[in-house]
Design a protein with these regions (language model features):
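Charged, glycine-rich active-site and insertion segments that engage polyanionic ligands
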Residues: 1-50, 54, 60-80, 150-152, ...
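Conserved alpha-helical scaffold flanking the Walker A/P-loop in AAA+ ATPase domains
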Residues: 19-25, 75-81, 100-124, 132, ...
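Short loop/turn elements that form and flank the Walker-type P-loop nucleotide-binding site
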Residues: 29-30, 82-87, 119-121, 148-151
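A short hydrophobic beta-strand->loop->alpha-helix junction that borders the nucleotide-binding pocket
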Residues: 37, 91-96
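Conserved amphipathic alpha-helical interaction elements at protein-protein interfaces in regulatory
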Residues: 57, 115, 146-147
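Flexible beta-alpha connector loops of hexameric P-loop NTPases
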Residues: 95-103, 130, 173-174
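Residues immediately C-terminal
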Residues: 97, 132, 147, 162
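Structural recognition of the conserved hydrophobic beta-strand(s) that form the central parallel beta-sheet
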Residues: 124-128, 141, 152-158
Length: 231
């Protein structure tokens, strides 16, 4: 099982944030530069993809299912994202072999932004792990944020780490959070199981988000250790 945000058709316990963004979009007040801040593993990237899918699939045959906070897997925009070929979504993240988002990735982003759009839909730039941008990357990104292309939205995702005030000041910051009890309920839904049956409660108190808990469980599965033995 993968928790890759691109593949998550369900949005767990962040539907209140999605509703807020949807209302802003309907009123034509959705900020074009959004910063989602919060602990790693909350589902901020998943939230971003759900918002984008809602907007891009509005006039499609199988639009986003807003009442269920769920992506319809049959909609065209979702299928294009899964195949890595949606022209209206550009994703920037740390590459597997690197620790930082480097200047070449931002240059490639700028080059793609300078190309004409294939359709009249909005374009969305999702930059995950924004705190890993190096200075050169930040400076290049700032220039784009100061004069963004028309009909283009930037969604920057920060895992509650320090980012330069000059970058933060360009965006509207939305603080994302879940209490620990809700995080446990979310991971139970994801795994379709009660994790309290196989994980020590004291150990669980050190892992605060669904993503953190999930990867803890996966790590111990690989190591073939019993989580009940750890506290």
């Amino acid at each position: 099982m993968s928790l890759s945000p691109i593949n998550q058709t369900n949005l767990f316990s962040l539907d209140n944030y999605l509703s807020e963004f949807v209302e802003l979009y309907k009123k034509k007040r959705l900020p074009t530069k959004i910063l989602l801040s919060g602990d790693k593993g909350l589902g901020k990237s998943t939230l971003a993809f759900h918002l984008v899918n809602y907007i891009l699939s509005i006039n499609e045959e199988h639009p986003y299912i807003i009442k269920e906070s769920k992506i319809n897997p049959d909609n065209k925009s979702y299928k294009l994202v899964i195949n890595g070929s949606n022209p209206n979504i550009l994703l920037v993240d740390t590459l597997s072999e690197k620790k930082n988002i480097d200047i070449n990735q931002i240059r490639e982003l700028i080059n793609n932004l300078n190309k004409s759009s294939f359709n009249n839909k909005e374009r969305f730039i999702i930059i995950d792990n924004i705190e890993t941008l190096n200075i050169s990357s930040i400076n290049a990104l700032l220039k784009v944020l100061e004069e963004p292309p028309s009909n283009t939205y930037f969604i920057l995702i920060n895992n509650d780490r320090f980012i330069l005030p000059t970058l933060k000041s360009r965006c509207i910051n939305f603080k994302i959070s879940l209490d620990h009890k809700t995080s446990i309920l979310v991971i139970n839904k994801i795994l379709d199981s009660d994790i309290m049956k196989f994980i020590n409660k004291d150990l669980l108190n050190y892992y605060l988000t669904p993503g953190q808990i999930y990867y803890l469980i996966e790590f111990f599965k690989i190591q073939k250790h019993d989580l009940k033995d750890y506290d």
